[in-house]
């Protein structure tokens, strides 16, 4: 299973090969939100990987500008569990400046992996969801001092430092 497809398709496929994962073994792509650094290669990945669908909520699908074939799309409701093969997937809301961004907890064989990307700030609900995770992937995409000293325009710095990241 992949979480997002924001890097180049070439890098994704090379990464699968480098880690010994067959393309046929990838069972889905879980989309966290529609920003280009999370979905850039979604069309090519869903086209090249024969057995997969991409999973997103309705608002995220509506906001994604890069087309994904209808037969490769699956829609879930944030807060409602669903299955991909033997994996129980629990999408939960996160604060970010996107249509309906989510984090995921993935359960299999009494293990929990939780993934939170681009979170503007940690909420009690997020803490409650991830507290028992056996593995937590938490994207920390800026350090305040480096961001403030960097070359981003002021409006972007303000947005990143805001409550929705």
Where do the protein language model's features map onto the residues?
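Active-site neighborhood of phospho(di)ester-bond hydrolases with catalytic His/Asp-centered motifs
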Residues: 2-6, 27-34, 55-58, 114-118, ...
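Cap/insert and terminal regions of metallo-dependent hydrolase folds
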Residues: 125-165
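Short amphipathic alpha-helix with an adjacent loop that forms part of the alpha/beta core around
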Residues: 16-20, 82-86, 126-129
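Active-site environment of divalent metal-dependent phosphoester hydrolases
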Residues: 35-39, 61-63, 98-99, 121-124, ...
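Metallo-beta-lactamase
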Residues: 56-110
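Conserved beta-strand hairpin/beta-sheet module of binuclear metal-dependent hydrolase folds
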Residues: 1-19, 102-118, 135
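Active-site metal-binding motif and surrounding structural segment of the metallo-beta-lactamase
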Residues: 9-56
